[in-house]
């Protein structure tokens, strides 16, 4: 004897998931022409930036949250973060930063999106405590420094690859 007010049907809607509330992170890897490891940051944001890559059958996109899952990817992507300094320190503490740096040293490709891009630089400073007050050393892969201010400014940036081999 259960009272039922109504039934809500399930419809698969192809709309963006909310940050971190998704089945994507449970997705099993598949065989593809290129292996892409996306770092599963604890405070990941805008992970839907990766969705176009997931839609390409020839790409094996996997989300990595520890060194045992890292494998031997062709490309590593560090996505955006809601707290860049905390997530960089998390990668440093669990060994993922070292894995990424070794991958880059072997000629592997590393991309950073938003906060991930900032992590690839020389340093990240947050003098006002916009995210987490203090200054930390970046991964040192790009000649950039980041200084957070109370008011965020978003600007488009473009660049060119100097020379890509392979």
Give the predicted meaning of each segment.
Residues 1-62, 66-74, 141-166:
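C-terminal lobe/tail of nucleotide-utilizing enzymes
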Residues 21-22, 77-79, 126-127:
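Short low-complexity, flexible loop/linker segments enriched in glycine and/or proline
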Residues 35-38, 44-115, 119:
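Phosphate-binding active sites in nucleotide-utilizing proteins
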Residues 81-166:
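Cysteine-nucleophile active-site neighborhood
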């Amino acid at each position: 004897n259960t009272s039922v007010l109504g039934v809500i049907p399930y419809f698969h809607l192809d709309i963006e998931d909310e940050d971190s509330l998704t089945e994507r992170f449970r997705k099993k890897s598949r065989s593809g022409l290129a292996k892409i490891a996306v770092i599963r940051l604890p405070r990941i944001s805008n992970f839907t930036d990766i969705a176009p890559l997931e839609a390409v059958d020839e790409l094996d996109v996997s989300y990595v949250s520890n060194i045992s899952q890292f494998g031997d990817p062709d490309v590593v992507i560090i996505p955006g973060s809601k707290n860049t300094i905390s997530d960089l320190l998390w990668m440093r503490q669990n060994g993922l930063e070292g894995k990424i740096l070794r991958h880059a040293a072997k000629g592997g490709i590393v991309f950073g999106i938003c906060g991930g891009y900032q992590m690839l630089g020389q340093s990240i400073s947050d003098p006002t405590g916009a995210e987490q007050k203090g200054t930390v050393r970046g991964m040192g892969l790009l000649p950039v420094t980041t200084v957070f201010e109370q008011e965020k400014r978003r600007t488009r940036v473009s660049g060119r690859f100097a020379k890509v081999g392979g």
